[in-house]
Structures are given as structure tokens and as C-alpha cells.
Amino acid sequence: MDSIKSKLRSIIRSHFLSVAGLIKRPSPYVYILNGHMVDWHHDNDSDGERFAKQLADLHKYCDFVNFEDAVRMIIKHESVKRCTVAFTFDDGWRDCYTQIAPQLEKYGVNAMFFINPNFADAADNNDVAYMENFTVNTTKSPGKHPITWDQMKDLQKRGFLFGAHTLDHYCIADNNIKELEHQIGDCRKVMEEKLGVPCEFFAFPYGRLEHANPAPIEIACKHYKYVFSQSDHKHFSHSAEE
């Protein structure tokens, strides 16, 4: 009996969400969506099919644009007639290369990938201890693998963009100015040295402003033209010069 009730609740919930989805559609604004990976605990390339379905469902209600175009639209307060979406992904996982990028290319758009350079270095140097600590302890994603610099360079040639995310996915909610300068400022230097292009974009690890404080925010704004968090998403701040 409990099993039947559970199934009925599931069916009712499914139908309710379907009807609610028909009533409520995304508002005609520009959205920059943030993700991390296709699957949290492994790198099964078949998961690209699931991401493809998610994109197909989203595309019914939203236009997809390149990341840099979305940034321009937001800064210039450009109006849009339909929900408009660009994509970012944090941490630099291998499925950014094997699954995410190939699916986005089918829609003719890129993404911004925010990278932790020391994680990518660990892949190139086969530093198993660092990769295990990063995946198990830092990001709670055991079984995942980093994107390599060669893969990033290939994606860069295909129009994808790369930003900074601190060297080690460092939680910047402290006042250790020396370490903050190292993690935030030196991250830009490494990104530019490895990829050969200016690195103007930075995203806070862990995503929200409570994971930062005035000191790291000031340092980030000193080193980067654009600084992203997941907080206060309805209020965009930019300089009067933009």
C-alpha cells in the first residue's frame, strides 16, 4: 500500500511540475548559468547524452549566446525579447573537454571555464597525491579527473574561454594578504603564461560572497577586469567606465 501511495505521489508531483512549467517560463533577461561537471563522481563519457538532453530542454525556452556576448549585454543593459543564457563551469574537470564543450558546440556557443591551475599542473605532472587531495578533500568529488593544458589549448582554438579560480581552489575568506595575493594574483600570471592570452575573468571558489571578505574582493578587482560570484545575482555592479 505504501508503495502504491509513493508511486501516486510521484505521478502527481510529476504532472504538477509539468503544468507549473507550462505556466511559468523564464523571464526575458540575460542569465549566466554556473555549473561544475556533468557527473559528480566519475568521468563516463556517456553522461554527455544527459547533458545534451538538459540543453535541449533548456533551449526550448531560452536562446544560447557566447559568454562574452552575455557579459556585454549585461554591462550595456541591453534588452532581450527572450530568456538568454550563457554558460560557465568551475574547477576545470576533464568532462569540460570530453562532454560539455562538444554539446555546446552543437548550438554554436562557447562557455567560460574557471580553472585552478595547480590542479591542471597535477594532471600533466601525474601528481597523484595532489589530485587525490583536491578531489577527495577540497572539492568532495572523488573519482574525477582534471582537464589538461593541452585540452584547454584545443578548446581555446575552438572559441572557448578560460578564467581564474585561484591556484588551489582556495577559500578566500581570510585576511592573509600574502596568500591571497599568491592565490588570486599569481593565478592570473600562470593562466596567461600557460594559455598565451590575457586572463581578465575571476570567479570566487565556493561561489558566494560569504566565502570572501573585503580584502580578497579588493585584490581580485585589482587583478581582474571581471569578478564573478553566485550571490546577489539580480544586481550587477560594474565601473562607470564600462
Regions found by a protein language model. Name each.
Residues 1-88, 95, 174-242:
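C-terminal active-site subregion of NodB/CE4 polysaccharide deacetylases
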